[in-house]
């Protein structure tokens, strides 16, 4: 039984683990470890289990600084993930990875709800909501990070790009090469947003939660 399992199941699992999508998620999520670990340290210090220490931190004005560092690191976890996953995917495809990460970040921000309703019922628009740049937006970040890079890489592989003459710096060449795929991807995100009234990331999250509740 064990031999049959090793012969039939293990190769399938290994094949799945070694797919570009899974490798990209793994490598991309690892990039968020450093800021999250640092943020966790500041979180522990800010909520130290000794009241006397907390009182000193509050009286000296250090606690708000600790909270700021903690909030800043945890509040961008989804942004780090979408950049890291996209970067890793493009790198596996041997394409320029940084532009891919930036395009994915822009796509994520386009699809993210950009308005909130205050307790008084006032709608505030044109914001970057930290709720969705943190853990709640992680599912959306993973999905965007797996959809954008294949499209980006397809354009570059098909040589559908703006070509620059020889002698132009590599950074400039890469930037212009990414213009066409960036235009198509960001325009597509805008069309999706127009048709969904800013509920795209919420839909991703709800579908994921509904699936795993079954």
Give residue spans per PLM region:
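Signature of multi-pass transmembrane helix bundles
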Residues: 1-37, 42-44, 54-58, 62-214
């Amino acid at each position: 039984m064990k031999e049959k399992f090793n012969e039939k199941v293990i190769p399938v699992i290994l094949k799945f683990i070694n797919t570009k999508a899974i490798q990209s998620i793994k490598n991309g999520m690892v990039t968020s470890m450093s800021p999250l670990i640092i943020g966790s340290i500041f979180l522990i210090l800010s909520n130290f289990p000794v009241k006397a220490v907390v009182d000193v931190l509050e009286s000296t004005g250090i606690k708000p600084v600790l909270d700021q560092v903690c909030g800043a690191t945890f509040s961008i976890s989804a942004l780090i993930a979408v950049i890291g996953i996209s970067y890793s995917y493009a790198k596996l495809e041997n394409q320029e990875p940084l532009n891919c990460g930036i395009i994915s970040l822009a796509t994520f921000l386009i699809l993210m709800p950009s308005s909130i309703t205050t307790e008084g019922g006032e709608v505030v628009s044109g914001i970057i909501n930290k709720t969705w740049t943190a853990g709640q937006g992680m599912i959306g970040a993973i999905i965007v990070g797996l959809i954008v890079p294949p499209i980006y890489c397809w354009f570059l592989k098909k040589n559908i790009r703006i070509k620059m003459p020889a002698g132009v710096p590599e950074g400039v060449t890469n930037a212009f090469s990414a213009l066409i795929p960036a235009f198509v991807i960001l325009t597509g995100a805008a069309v999706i947003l127009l048709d969904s009234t800013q509920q795209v990331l919420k839909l991703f999250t709800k579908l994921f939660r509904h699936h795993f509740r079954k």
